[in-house]
Regions:
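Hydrophobic alpha-helical transmembrane segments of multi-pass integral membrane proteins
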Residues: 134-147, 164-187, 341-373
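Transmembrane alpha-helix boundary signature
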Residues: 77-85, 104-119, 148
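Hydrophobic core segments of alpha-helical transmembrane domains in multi-pass membrane transport
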Residues: 25-40, 64-79, 96-110, 135-143, ...
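Transmembrane helical segments that form the transport core of multi-pass membrane transport proteins
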Residues: 290-377
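Interfacial loop-to-helix junctions that mark the boundaries of transmembrane helices
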Residues: 16-20, 49-64, 86-92, 120-129, ...
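Hydrophobic transmembrane alpha-helices that form the pore/transport pathway of multi-pass ion
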Residues: 1, 146-213, 371-380
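Intrinsically disordered, low-complexity non-transmembrane regions of multi-pass membrane transporters
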Residues: 1-29, 85-86, 255-306
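C-terminal transmembrane helix pair
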Residues: 26-31, 200-224, 228, 239-246, ...
């Protein structure tokens, strides 16, 4: 009789384990399909996230415009309610009000009142699309990526190699996939969310947001079409150089000096195993899992996104306005180009003036840099410039305002130092590549 009871308990336990695994596999697969697998709909090969975004952009553009205005108005009211004798708060209200005027002028087709360069307006609109549509939609589905075992499974299989090469945990690999396959807007939110929930350390967060946010598959595809280079070959080169850059930068100042502590001490347990990886990952997931339902998690993620966008959108609009002014003052751009040219010339690279101009434009926007590329350059020159565009730039128009407005502990000085370190490493690699190419 006792043997029968034990047998029944064993069968029930194995049955429960099976259904637990199936649930994790199904939910993780849904997340992978939604975020990473391109599907062809109406002759457009995109992920489900972007198909939904484009549909809403075409069918509900007026609602989106109203939503953007609503975000800024909410942000202004929030500052007004918290107003005190602090002059910084008053300046923020003025800047956000000015951003609201700029946004309305863009919506009514009067953007030339504030912007001289049409490319900057196009880039700003594209970024607003990612912020106002893609990110909120992605946030609704993001629990499938972060809350149902995929983080633990990814960490189980990639933790050892990520630790050895980049000094980060294996869960960063999943975050990297969001950066490269979705966009850096969603990627930076995933980094923020992992850090806020006590799943990433301070140093890991800094390394992730500064080292893994530079590469984008969609940008690589556009770049290769522009310079007529085979995408897969160029992408392999990007990955190799990215690994070299990140390997070095994660081991030197300032990222090396970042604290290993968490934003707060949660009960989250990391996955670090050599055997039985899938079983260990599932066990860790059930130790870490939230008791919230899927709908509650989705709404919680959306609420966080809305709260972030309230301050982020007006800040980005104002930054684009300042960039527009700087970009159209010849003296400033020439001075910056001359300084960059001195640096590039020291490495004896060809067409140093062109490379310097591309590097500086890339600080503002990769699209500006791509548009400025000449079509009739030599293959090696295209290759070098393409590497600079693809990997050199930290997106200052997005990352700096996001980081400074969030709980992520990075100073502007640290961001600029990391950007300069990457520039030096890439320039040195291009120098070696060019001299090897010439020797052949």
């Amino acid at each position: 009789m006792e043997k029968t009871k034990k047998s029944c308990r064993s069968n029930n336990s194995s049955s429960n384990d099976f259904f637990k695994k199936v649930k994790i596999y199904i939910f993780s697969l849904i997340g992978i399909i939604i975020f990473f697998i391109p599907i062809k709909i109406n002759n457009e090969l995109e992920t489900i996230i972007y198909h939904i975004s484009y549909f809403l952009e075409n069918e509900a553009s007026s609602i989106i415009e109203i939503s953007l205005i609503f975000f800024i108005v909410l942000s202004i009211f929030k500052n007004i309610l918290n107003i005190d004798k602090n002059n910084v708060n008053k300046i923020e209200i003025c800047c956000k009000s000015f951003s609201l005027v700029i946004l309305v002028s863009i919506f009514v087709g009067k953007e030339d009142l504030f912007f001289i360069n049409d490319n900057l307006v196009f880039i700003l609109k594209d970024l607003m699309l990612d912020l106002s549509i893609t990110l909120p939609i992605a946030s609704l589905f993001m629990p499938f990526l972060l809350e149902y075992g995929l983080v633990e499974i990814t960490e189980a299989y990639t933790n050892r190699i990520m630790k050895k090469i980049f000094k980060v945990s294996g869960k960063v690999f999943l975050n990297f996939l969001v950066y490269i396959l979705v966009n850096n807007v969603c990627g930076v939110f995933v980094t923020y969310k992992l850090y806020k929930d006590g799943k990433l350390r301070r140093r890991e967060t800094a390394i992730t947001i500064l080292n893994f946010s530079v590469l984008s598959l969609s940008l690589t595809d556009d770049l290769c079409n522009k310079i007529n280079i085979i995408t897969i070959k160029f992408f392999i080169m990007e990955i190799i150089i990215l690994i070299i850059c990140n390997f070095i930068i994660s081991r030197i100042y300032p990222l090396k000096k970042k604290k290993q502590s968490y934003y707060f001490k949660s009960n989250h347990k990391n996955v670090n195993c050599k055997r039985n990886k899938i079983n260990t990952a599932i066990k860790r997931y059930y130790e870490n899992k939230s008791n919230k339902k899927l709908l509650s998690l989705s709404l919680s993620y959306l609420n966080e996104v809305i709260y972030i966008l309230m301050d982020l959108i007006p800040t980005i609009i104002f930054i684009f306005f300042i960039v527009n002014i700087i970009y159209n003052i010849p003296f400033i751009m020439e001075s910056i180009n001359n300084l960059t040219n001195i640096f590039v010339s020291a490495f004896n690279l060809p067409n140093s003036n062109l490379i310097s101009n591309i590097i500086n434009l890339n600080l503002f926007s990769s699209i500006l840099a791509i548009e400025s590329m000449p079509q009739n350059s030599y293959y090696i020159i295209k290759l070098i410039i393409g590497i600079f565009i693809a990997l050199q730039c930290i997106n200052f128009c997005l990352l700096i305002p996001f980081i400074k407005g969030s709980i992520i502990e990075l100073t502007i000085g640290e961001i600029l130092i990391v950007a300069f370190e990457r520039l030096c490493i890439i320039t040195f690699i291009c120098f070696i590549t060019y001299n090897f190419y010439c020797a052949i």
